[in-house]
Regions:
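C-terminal edge and immediately downstream basic/flexible tail or linker adjoining helix-turn-helix-like DNA-binding
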Residues: 2-8, 19, 48, 105, ...
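Internal acidic/polar
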Residues: 6-13, 91, 96-126, 146
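Residues within the DNA-recognition helix of helix-turn-helix
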Residues: 35, 164-171
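Arg/Lys-rich amphipathic alpha helix in sigma70-family domain 2
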Residues: 66-73, 83-104, 173
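Short helix-coil-helix linker/hinge
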Residues: 126-134
Length: 185
C-alpha cells in the first residue's frame, strides 16, 4: 500500500510548503525537485558559472530549509524563495569582493570575450554587465519581478532599480547587436 509521500508529486505546492514548515523532509525534497532547475538557472544568469551556480542554489535550499518555519504565508513561497536566492547571491558578491580587496584584485574585472567570430549568447552578454545591472535585469526579465519587488528584494532605491534595468537592457542590446552583425571590438 502506498504511503502518503508517494502522492507528493501530485500535491499542490502550498500543501507541500505547509508540510515542510512542520518538518516533513519528504515534502521539502519534492519542493526542491520542483524548484531546483529554476533556482539553478537564476544563479547561472547571475554568475555565468555552472559549478558556482549549483553551489549557490544548494545554499539557497539549505537556507530555505533552515528558515521555512518562519514563512508566514505559504502562498508567498515563490517570492520568498526568490528573495532568498537574491540574498545568497548578494552575500556571495560581498564575500568575493572582500576577498578581491584583500588580494589587491580590481573590482572592475569582467568576463573575458570569446575570440572574434564566435557568437555571443545571452548569458555571455549578461556577464558583461556590471553586477548591479545584471541583477536587476535578470530579476525583471527572467523572473518577471516588478521594479518595486526588485527594490524591496535588493534594498536598492526604486529609481536606481529603474535606471539599472533601462541602462542594462540598452547595454545588452548593444552587446548583442555587435555580435549579431559580425562586428568585433
Amino acid at each position: 500500500m502506498p504511503g502518503a509521500r508517494d502522492y507528493y508529486p501530485e500535491c499542490p505546492e502550498a500543501f507541500l510548503v505547509s508540510l515542510a514548515r512542520g518538518g516533513d523532509r519528504h515534502a521539502f525534497a519534492e519542493i526542491v525537485r520542483r524548484r531546483q532547475s529554476s533556482i539553478r538557472n537564476l544563479m547561472r544568469r547571475f554568475c555565468n558559472d555552472r559549478p558556482l551556480a549549483d553551489d549557490l542554489a544548494q545554499q539557497v535550499f539549505l537556507k530555505v530549509w533552515l528558515n521555512i518555519r518562519g514563512l508566514k504565508k505559504v502562498e508567498a513561497f515563490g517570492g520568498w524563495l526568490r528573495r532568498i536566492a537574491v540574498s545568497v547571491w548578494l552575500h556571495h558578491l560581498r564575500h568575493r569582493d572582500a576577498l578581491r580587496g584583500a588580494s589587491g584584485l580590481s573590482g572592475d574585472e569582467r568576463a573575458t570575450r570569446e575570440t572574434a567570430g564566435v557568437a555571443l549568447d545571452l548569458d555571455r552578454a549578461l556577464a558583461t554587465l556590471p553586477e548591479a545591472e545584471r541583477l536587476c535585469v535578470v530579476l525583471s526579465y527572467n523572473e518577471g519581478m516588478s521594479h518595486r519587488e526588485i527594490a524591496e528584494t535588493t534594498d536598492l532605491p526604486l529609481g536606481t532599480v529603474k535606471s539599472h534595468i533601462r541602462i542594462g537592457a540598452r547595454r545588452l542590446q548593444s552587446e548583442l547587436d555587435v555580435y549579431a552583425g559580425g562586428n568585433t571590438r
